[in-house]
């Protein structure tokens, strides 16, 4: 199945690319999420008319993500959790906790934008957390987990 991408899709292509994908991926994911349209002659013509509008929207999203990344880089966020001896936390600090703390500090962040490659944080200490704000923008957050 051939589709035209309406936005950048990781490991597939960028705005305006005509790519061939498996039918289920196109019908069940790309088209319903608004990331692509079927590559018919009518859709190709319609896309060419809307290309400038879509490119402008994509550049605005990128600029907004870069502004959020700069704001996140200036933050120092602290999260207090109950902890036992040697700084081992009762429970853990996950993506939801981090997203709520950053949002409370003034920069809106969604839970799915927080990357914890080693799983939830289970020890008190200082951490550098990666936030994936856009397909082209990553930010680093300084997080301090305080054991009470």
Curated annotation (Swiss-Prot):
Gene3D superfamilies xref list: Ribosomal protein L9, C-terminal domain (3.10.430.100), Ribosomal protein L9, N-terminal domain (3.40.5.10)
Presence of the UniProt keyword rRNA-binding in the record: yes
UniProt-listed GO biological process terms: translation
UniProt-listed InterPro entries: Ribosomal_bL9 (IPR000244), Ribosomal_bL9/RNase_H1_N (IPR009027), Ribosomal_bL9_bac/chp (IPR020594), Ribosomal_bL9_C (IPR020069), Ribosomal_bL9_C_sf (IPR036791), Ribosomal_bL9_N (IPR020070), Ribosomal_bL9_N_sf (IPR036935)
Record-annotated membrane-spanning stretches: none
A Pfam family matched in the record: Ribosomal_L9_N
Superkingdom as given in the UniProt entry: Bacteria
Keywords: Ribonucleoprotein, Ribosomal protein, RNA-binding, rRNA-binding
GO cellular component: ribonucleoprotein complex; ribosome
Keyword Hydrolase: no
MF terms (GO), sorted A to Z: rRNA binding; structural constituent of ribosome
Entries under PANTHER family matching the protein: 50S RIBOSOMAL PROTEIN L9
Entry function: Binds to the 23S rRNA.
Family listed: Belongs to the bacterial ribosomal protein bL9 family.
Protein name: Large ribosomal subunit protein bL9
Organism this protein belongs to: Methylococcus capsulatus (strain ATCC 33009 / NCIMB 11132 / Bath)
Gene name of the encoded protein: rplI
